[in-house]
């Protein structure tokens, strides 16, 4: 007999995380960049919480679902491969947080892993985007640099703000309480 990955409670918690993160992405964008990407108020954290609460499989499924929803709500791509890289894979990487769910400082480590994974997929996508404009070796190096600067300009500020918030003792305690409630 196989164990269900999702109970009704897990589905509800994951659906609420997806809904809340989607509303935050749509309603509260600090700087919004012209080619996609923006600093949001903790939307990546909210998706990473699903992995932190329930482990890698529910975390990855929830994060991929969020990525698909982000594509439906506001797609931006130049090359068809970017659809896969920028949405289900990049946002899906936030579910990597689930691999740290039972570790000390699991939320912090999982969040960093998720954002790093998201960065890697956006970096590959950005390289594809920028190489549409340049075609030689020097151009490829410039494409990598341009993609790195562009992606870090919104991912890094949000990550730093979130890590500062998560390092606060009251927030750390609150997150532990929410995790026990989600798992009860």
What are these regions (language model features)?
Residues 1-52, 57-58, 93-101, 166-170:
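Hydrophobic transmembrane alpha-helices
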């Amino acid at each position: 007999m196989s164990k269900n990955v999702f109970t009704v409670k897990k589905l509800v918690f994951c659906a609420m995380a997806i809904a809340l993160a989607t509303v935050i992405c749509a309603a509260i964008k600090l700087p919004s960049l012209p080619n996609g990407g923006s600093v949001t108020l903790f939307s990546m954290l909210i998706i990473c919480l699903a992995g932190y609460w329930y482990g890698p499989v529910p975390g990855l499924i929830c994060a991929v679902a969020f990525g698909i929803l982000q594509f439906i709500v506001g797609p931006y791509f130049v090359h068809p491969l970017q659809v896969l890289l920028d949405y289900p894979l990049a946002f899906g990487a936030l579910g990597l947080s689930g691999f740290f769910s039972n570790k000390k400082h699991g939320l912090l480590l999982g969040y960093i892993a998720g954002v790093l994974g998201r960065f890697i997929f956006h970096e590959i996508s950005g390289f594809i985007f920028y190489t549409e404009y340049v075609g030689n070796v020097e151009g490829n190096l410039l494409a990598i640099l341009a993609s790195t600067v562009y992606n870090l300009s919104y991912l890094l500020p949000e990550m730093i703000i979130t890590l500062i918030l998560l390092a606060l003792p009251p927030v750390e305690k609150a997150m532990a309480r929410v995790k026990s409630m989600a798992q009860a």
